[in-house]
A protein has these predicted regions:
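Helix-loop-helix hairpins and the membrane-proximal interhelical loops
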Residues: 9-76, 128-149, 236-248, 405-460
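Glycine-rich, mobile lid/loop segments that gate access to catalytic sites or pores
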Residues: 171, 179, 183, 187, ...
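Short, non-helical or kinked segments that cap or interrupt transmembrane helices
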Residues: 86-97, 101-104, 168-180, 274-281, ...
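Transmembrane alpha-helical segments of multi-pass membrane transport proteins and ion-pumping complexes
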Residues: 74, 78-89, 115-128, 154, ...
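Membrane-interface alpha-helices at helix entry/exit sites of multi-pass transporters
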Residues: 100-113, 461-465, 503, 507-514
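Interfacial loop-to-transmembrane junctions
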Residues: 23-28, 458, 502-526
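Hydrophobic alpha-helical bundle architecture
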Residues: 167, 451-487, 514-518
């Protein structure tokens, strides 16, 4: 009995006769008008929401300089997400375009809409995971000149690298240069203050993020290849393994599968990648307008009462574990520990003292919304140091607390995170608009590379569906665990994996370029951001 599955050489032959999609059609005037209308509306909405938040806290504006710096920083951060949109999301639409499942411009708009929804419905876990990589002293003083230099340096470095790889048509990662830029700023900051360069980065967090970025293309390649082989074994419909004929769309069920996976990748990309910009925007807002954004002022008053109660029992447990007197400056002890990861005998008493101090302050105010504007920044900084110290102590096994004390510490950390790790709706909307509109600009270069230059023959339906499915699930899983991952690397390596599994052949010139970009991105971004940080600290 013969199998109904097409042999690999037959698939390759059929793929070679496929018709390429027409990508040169320009959008009409109405499309351009809608694009700029949405862009203008988003900017005006963001500006209005920002001013409304400042008005709500009753703060008097004495100088417009912080708002000018804030505006520039926010535009650069949103610019990063805009570039991220057309740089990364082109990968999501390449398969539906090259299989004629959707017309090119409709596919791009469709992807942009689901990127938008992905950002709006994201959890925020990735956003604050990115911030944890930054040097602690710059996080605590992000509103200073050095803090602005940090933000400008890492964002400009990431944008320049993304634009460079896009210009060359390379589907390189947008996450890689951002992580490299953060590391570069941390190393430069440490060296400029006379410390070992490695002390400027939380290498435990950086390693965790690095594994997710470095392993994701390998996962994409292997899993997409295995999924294609499993499809050939289990699904006997020959139409699935053919390349498109002419400009005709595929059978309805194949078309639906490809559109579904494209939609899933777009949504997952928005949910994961959009958070990187949100995290940096929140860092900027907290540094420049702490009275409005340092603490979540929308939390009900009973949450403040619970916060104070948990702080009190946590302090008592810590004092019981280490009854020695608290140091004169507990904040400095915790700051030194968070920066150096070296525990001193004063660490636990310092943590107990600061925990009690935070609890008493919140209890005295009665609600987070009643914390005075001039105290907001200090209260948040104390909370940040306490939360990070608890996280690192738990990770490193410092203190050897009993189960009850560990539980109280984690409960208090969760209360702190609830009060400090929040993202206003307008920030999500602004990032969603930037990422969604970016999806609709400049996508052709990357689409051509993914659709034509990775494998020798034309992409088949099964190959497109396999690569997209693996990308969707991988990015979704990373988002669930709060890890940044590269949509580009997962999907382009998935396409390569299906070509290899099918015996179709790879275009090794493109593969070499992709590997070179993969290897060079981190060191190049580190060097570029470190240089920019040094230069900007001299100018500010």
């Amino acid at each position: 009995m013969t199998s109904d599955v097409l042999p690999a050489d037959a698939v390759a032959s059929a793929a070679g006769n496929a018709h390429k999609p027409h990508l040169e059609q320009r959008p009409g005037r109405l499309t351009a008008l809608v694009f700029f209308a949405v862009l203008a509306t988003g900017l005006l909405f963001s500006a209005y929401s920002l001013m409304q938040d400042v008005d709500d806290v009753g703060s008097t504006i004495t100088t417009w300089t912080p708002f000018l710096l804030l505006g520039v920083a926010l535009l650069i951060a949103l610019g990063f997400e805009f570039v991220n949109g057309f740089h990364d999301t082109a990968n999501a639409v390449a398969t539906v375009i090259y299989t004629h499942s959707l017309p090119p411009h409709f596919a791009v708009v469709w992807s942009g809409c689901f990127n938008f929804l992905g950002v709006l419905l994201s959890s925020g876990a990735v956003a604050f995971g990115i911030i944890a990589l930054l040097p602690v002293e710059l996080i605590l003083q992000v509103g200073s000149s050095a803090g602005f230099a940090m933000v400008f340096a890492l964002l400009i470095a990431a944008i320049l690298w993304n634009l460079g790889t896009w210009w060359l048509g390379l589907p390189a990662s947008s996450s890689h240069p951002l992580i490299g830029s953060i590391i570069g700023v941390g190393v430069a900051n440490a060296l400029m203050h006379g410390r070992d360069g490695t002390s400027g980065v939380d290498w435990g967090q950086a390693t965790k993020v690095g594994y997710s970025l470095l392993l994701s293309p390998l996962i994409g390649f292997a899993c997409a290849a295995l999924l294609l082989l499993a499809l050939r074994l289990l699904v006997k419909n020959r139409a699935l393994y053919k390349a498109p004929k002419g400009k005709a769309p595929p059978p309805w069920w194949i078309r639906g599968l490809l559109i579904l996976t494209c939609t899933g990748v777009s949504f997952a990309h928005g949910s994961n990648d959009g958070q990187k910009g949100m995290g940096l925007i929140m860092l900027i807002l907290v540094g420049t307008l702490p009275m409005a954004y340092a603490l979540n002022r929308t939390m009900p008053a009973d949450q403040a009462v619970q916060f104070a109660a948990v702080a009190e029992v946590t302090q008592q447990a810590l004092v019981k574990s280490a009854p020695q007197p608290a140091p004169a400056d507990p904040r400095q002890v915790l700051s030194d520990y968070v920066r150096s990861k070296q525990a001193s005998p004063e660490l636990i008493p310092a943590l107990a003292a600061l925990t009690g101090s935070i609890g008493q302050e919140v209890k005295g105010y009665g609600a987070f919304s009643r914390v005075p504007a001039e105290a907001m920044g200090n209260v948040r900084n104390d909370m940040y140091l306490t939360s990070e110290a608890i996280r690192l102590m738990d990770k490193d096994g410092v203190g050897r607390f009993d189960a009850d004390t560990r539980g109280k510490l984690q409960a208090f950390k969760q209360k702190i995170d609830d009060a400090t790790k929040f993202i206003p709706l307008w920030v999500k909307i602004a990032v969603a608009i930037a990422l969604g509109l970016g999806t609709m600009v400049g996508w052709k270069r990357i689409v051509v590379t993914v659709g034509e230059k990775i494998g020798k023959p034309h992409l088949t339906y099964a190959q497109g569906a396999s690569a997209e499915t693996v990308a969707m699930l991988t990015i979704g899983a990373a988002d669930l665990y709060g890890l940044p991952v590269s949509t580009t690397h997962v999907l382009s390596s998935g396409v390569a994996g299906t070509m290899a599994a099918n015996g179709s052949g790879l275009q090794w010139k493109t593969i070499r370029n992709l590997l070179m970009a993969w290897v060079l991105t981190l060191p190049a971004a580190i060097l570029l951001s470190a240089s920019l940080y040094w230069l900007l600290t001299r100018l500010f």
